[in-house]
Amino acid sequence: MKQGIHPEYKEITATCSCGNVIKTRSTVEKNLNLDVCGNCHPFYTGKQRVVDTGGRVERFNKRFNIPSTK
C-alpha cells in the first residue's frame, strides 16, 4: 500500500435508539446514531416493532385510506 494516501482509521461510537452503545472503527470521524441494532432488530428478537421516522406510516395510511390500528 502507498504511504500517506489513506485516511486515518479512528475509533467511533455507534448509539442505537434502544440505548445499546457499540464501539467500532471507521474513517468517518463522527459518532453514529442507529435506528436498530442486533439487540432490538425484529429478526433477532422475534418481536415486531414499528420504526416510524417522521410520521411516514401515518402519511401512507392516510394516502391509501387505511384505518389506524391505535
Curated annotation (Swiss-Prot):
Top-rank taxon, per record: Bacteria
PROSITE patterns, sorted: RIBOSOMAL_L31
Stored InterPro entries: Ribosomal_bL28/bL31-like_sf, Ribosomal_bL31, Ribosomal_bL31_A, Ribosomal_bL31_sf
SUPFAM superfamilies associated with the record: L28p-like (SSF143800)
Positions contributing to Zn(2+) binding: C16, C18, C37, C40
Keyword Kinase: no
GO biological process: translation
Cofactor: Zn(2+)
UniProt entry keywords in alphabetical sequence: Metal-binding, Ribonucleoprotein, Ribosomal protein, RNA-binding, rRNA-binding, Zinc
GO molecular function: metal ion binding; rRNA binding; structural constituent of ribosome
Family matches, as Gene3D superfamilies: Ribosomal protein L31
Any single Gene Ontology cellular-component annotation: ribonucleoprotein complex
Cofactor binding, note field: Binds 1 zinc ion per subunit.
Subunit structure comment from the entry: Part of the 50S ribosomal subunit.
Entry similarity comment: Belongs to the bacterial ribosomal protein bL31 family. Type A subfamily.
Role, per record: Binds the 23S rRNA.
Database matches in HAMAP family: Ribosomal_bL31_1 (MF_00501)
Protein name: Large ribosomal subunit protein bL31
Gene: rpmE
